[in-house]
Amino acid sequence: MAEAGVGSAEGAEEERRAVEENFPVDGNSCIASGVPSLMNPITKPATTSFNNSVVEIPRKRKGSDSDNQDTVEVDGDPQKRNEDEEHLKIKDFREAHSQTEKRRRDKMNNLIEELSAMIPQCNPMARKLDKLTVLRMAVQHLKSLKGSTSSYTEVRYKPSFLKDDELRQLILRAADGFLFVVGCNRGKILFVSESVCKILNYDQTSLIGQSLFDYLHPKDVAKVKEQLSSSDVSPREKLVDGKTGLQVHTDFQAGPARLNSGARRSFFCRIKCSRTTVKEEKECLPNPKKKDHRKYCTIHCTGYMKNWPPSEVGVEEENDVEKNSSNFNCLVAIGRLHPYIVPQKSGEIKVKATEFVTRFAMDGKFVYVDQRATAILGYLPQELLGTSCYEYCHQDDHNHLAEKHKEVLQNKEKVFTNSYKFRAKDGSFITLKSQWFSFMNPWTKELEYIVSNNTVVLGHNESAEEQVSYGSQPAEGAVKQSLVSVPGMSSGTVLGAGSIGTEIANEILELQRLHSSPPGELSPSHLLRKSPSPALTVNCSNVPNKELIQLCPSEAEVLETSEQNQGAIPFPSNEPLLGGNSQLDFAICENDDTAMTALMNYLEADGGLGDPAELSDIQWAL
């Protein structure tokens, strides 16, 4: 039995050695790390006892159990090893990810610290700012620079066919101002364009080399200095610390070295004017006692900052000031005169003037009516087309409008009328002011139409009684006459007033014919009359200098009819409306039938309705 026990002990010892050789126990072993509890019964007696017999006795007693455990452990080893390997891979991946995140955080912190050192607003801070505050300050600093590269390079683009002087003249003409260059250190005027004479009435040579601060209003000097010296003139945002929640106060002032080329500038200032300009301002300003307004003009300056080498600008004498910066900083801007706005009276509401546009032919007949006229006058555009504007104007305004009508036909400039009354559709009168100018066809060199920009001065504010009283008061020098009351017409208008414009147009055409060279070269407008032919020559007293006017046959027939009836020679069918004794006196008629007959005879003579030759030209519908 003793030998058998010894033999079994030796067999167990050999099996243990074989297991140790196949699966060494060390720090990197999978079994040692994965199943330490299974190895403890084998390794623990060896480490705690130095006697071989003591080690062999417990193994002898538990020989069968340990054999079974070792057999099971060896049989399930591949699956266990796979789980251990996966566990190690996950552990290694987590360790590598944590190391990567740590390196990224360290790198970001270093970049934030470098950014904080580069931002001027962060330097005066005694404590360390959080990351969010540093980023906000960086954004604010970048906004203050206002794009020094891209916006500045855009200024250099110009068409290749334009020279620098031509481009400068075009810019000054479009801006309606003067160009000037001012140094940022002392405010010295380095350049000013010749157009400054038109605005400030100063000579160009008298301003170059002078200090801009000497011409500024005392209260505007500090503002202009701020624009010339500070690189951050825009209102800053309120910065709040993310950790403490308190507002961060920054006391930072930009030095000359921080002025950035291309930074935009726009400000208003008051500049001293010359004496001749002061005299003009005394008349337009409501309070001439204020000396500041009389001496200074408000100028709107817009431009950008520019860096130049001192040698290019010619400021060698200022090199002592430019020690801290390699380039010379200056402001390039355009100054435009800001118009003076008269203060509005208290209680008044400033409303945009009501306007509408119309077009007339040479004889004053509407050829185009703006749609806005419907809301003002009540007429539809098609109701006014083809009718004369004199038919709707008050009779007391005919003389004034006729003078302006002649003026706009003879001149190419704009003509402004005084206030006149225009009859609306409901019978009331609206006060208008008009601006007339003639449009010439660029191909035929003939007048196409007259454009009229009409502005409402007073709305529908006159009743019928006021209109009658207004019409009953004639102009100065006019003879009081009895007016005809025709049903459907306002009391202020005159029957047959539409021929006034035709008379004026014919008069202007005849004057042009007389003052022109050979008659064959004359090309009168075909809108009013046919080509002239020798017919009848009359002496018209209303034509300047008693010129002789050549009339067409249709006009001659009207004159012959008027000679037989009245024994006088008036202007053909139109003159009675302008002269002082030209009103149709229907009061001599005994009854309404006689007045109506006379009215129809006049309309036939005026419109040519009784001429059978003209009826043949009408295209009758079949």
UniProtKB/Swiss-Prot annotation:
GO terms for biological process: positive regulation of circadian rhythm; positive regulation of DNA-templated transcription; regulation of transcription by RNA polymerase II; rhythmic process. Expressed in the pineal gland. It is found in: Nucleus. Residues 163-235, 342-412 form the PAS domain. Residues 45-54 have a biased composition (Polar residues). SMART domains: HLH, PAS. Pfam families: HLH (PF00010), PAS (PF00989), PAS_11 (PF14598). Residues 92-145 form the bHLH domain. Residues 1-29, 41-86 are annotated as: Disordered. The record marks H97, E101, R105 as: Interaction with E-box DNA. InterPro entries: bHLH_dom (IPR011598), Circadian_TF (IPR050933), HLH_DNA-bd_sf (IPR036638), Nuc_translocat (IPR001067), PAS (IPR000014), PAS-like_dom_sf (IPR035965), PAS_fold (IPR013767). Residues 67-76 have a biased composition (Acidic residues). One of its GO terms (cellular component) is cytoplasm. Residues 417-460 form the PAC domain. One of its GO terms (molecular function) is E-box binding. The record marks L145 as: Important for interaction with CLOCK. Residues 77-86 have a biased composition (Basic and acidic residues). Residues 1-10 have a biased composition (Low complexity). Induction: Expression in the pineal gland exhibits circadian rhythm. Maximum levels expressed at CT14, and between ZT14 and ZT18. Keywords: Activator, Biological rhythms, DNA-binding, Nucleus, Repeat, Transcription, Transcription regulation. Component of the circadian core oscillator, which includes the CRY proteins, CLOCK, or NPAS2, BMAL1 or BMAL2, CSNK1D and/or CSNK1E, TIMELESS and the PER proteins. Interacts directly with CLOCK to form the BMAL2-CLOCK transactivator. Can form heterodimers or homodimers which interact directly with CLOCK to form the transcription activator. Transcriptional activator which forms a core component of the circadian clock. The circadian clock, an internal time-keeping system, regulates various physiological processes through the generation of approximately 24 hour circadian rhythms in gene expression, which are translated into rhythms in metabolism and behavior. It is derived from the Latin roots 'circa' (about) and 'diem' (day) and acts as an important regulator of a wide array of physiological functions including metabolism, sleep, body temperature, blood pressure, endocrine, immune, cardiovascular, and renal function. This is Basic helix-loop-helix ARNT-like protein 2. It comes from Gallus gallus.
